[in-house]
From Swiss-Prot:
Gene3D superfamilies: Alpha-1-antitrypsin, domain 1, Antithrombin, subunit I, domain 2. It comes from Fowlpox virus (strain NVSL) (FPV). PANTHER family: GH10112P-RELATED, SERINE PROTEASE INHIBITOR, SERPIN. GO terms for cellular component: extracellular space. Pfam families: Serpin. Keywords: Protease inhibitor, Serine protease inhibitor. The lineage of its organism: Viruses, Varidnaviria, Bamfordvirae, Nucleocytoviricota, Pokkesviricetes. This is Uncharacterized serpin-like protein FPV204. It comes from the Viruses. Signal peptide: none annotated. Belongs to the serpin family. Poxviruses subfamily. GO terms for molecular function: serine-type endopeptidase inhibitor activity.
Amino acid sequence: MFAISVLKELYDSGEPLLFSPRGLHKILCNIRHGCNGNTKNQLDNLLEETIYDYGEDQALKHIITNISVLLIKRCYNINEKFIKDSNTIYNTDVLEFYNVRQIPRIMNKWIRSRSNNKITDIGCHIYDNTKSIIAEAMFFTMKHESIFGSTRKDTITFYKYDGTSLPVEAIHADPYYYPYRYFDDIKCSVLQLWKLGYAFNMFIILPDDEKGLDNLVDNITGDVFSKIMTEQMDYKRLELRMPVFSISQETNFCMPIFNLGCHSMFIDGDFSGISEVSDFQLSGIIQKNIIEVQYDKVKTTKPLNVRCSSFYVNKPFIFIVTDVGNYDTIPILLGIYQGSSK
């Protein structure tokens, strides 16, 4: 299970997290497209065979921006077919640089232009012997979506992993019927916020206590993860309070991917489908993700006097963003909120 394997590599107790399993899968598939021999075999073992439509839906650009680029030193004479396939299949730009000192300027100019300044920069982790970097970036916002019938701003006490607590700004939604299920094997409640822009779902995975994510990450399996996203849940009338927040995170995936068995990519890899120059190597796998879980369309209303169960998202939790109607095991975004202020 690709997403779970990566989550287990990245998880750090008490620390926030945000990455795009779908985006990482895309750029690794893009690299695999130009690999042969053991390098390709190791990527085959890590990646799932499903190929997605990686094109951008212009109608959803107010919610999501997803871009990727492969930056290669000019001396490697990139295969023209690989460039074309990167563009048409994986929606990835292929650019060249002459000197490693150019990389930050080229990368940041590209990311500002392609994201319409929603993302302004990305760390490149360059070295004197950098030969190529593949980077992927995603911006996802819920600010302009009204997914609740009646909401108001609130403040809740959030209980952090380290035993402290802090007040956080929250959304308070009046009672509503949500897809909901309790998973006893991972001791978590799962609530689904659905049809964001009529295109996306968000799943909130809330452990029983503030340290429960340790047990969840240790014990969650691909089967359970798939059930969360694919099985029909019962609808339950709940009064929801959950934090509003923004998370921005950059990740260099070289070590996690190496740890997941793709050693050849970084040691004598066979990239003959990308370049015929034998010493070509992949020097960096970088991702930057930004999510805004905020709501512009908040009404100032008085609470309804309706009795029902409460669902307070007041401890560290996992959130997953998926496509509506495309329930699969490689989410668009997967993150952990730890209670940091907005």
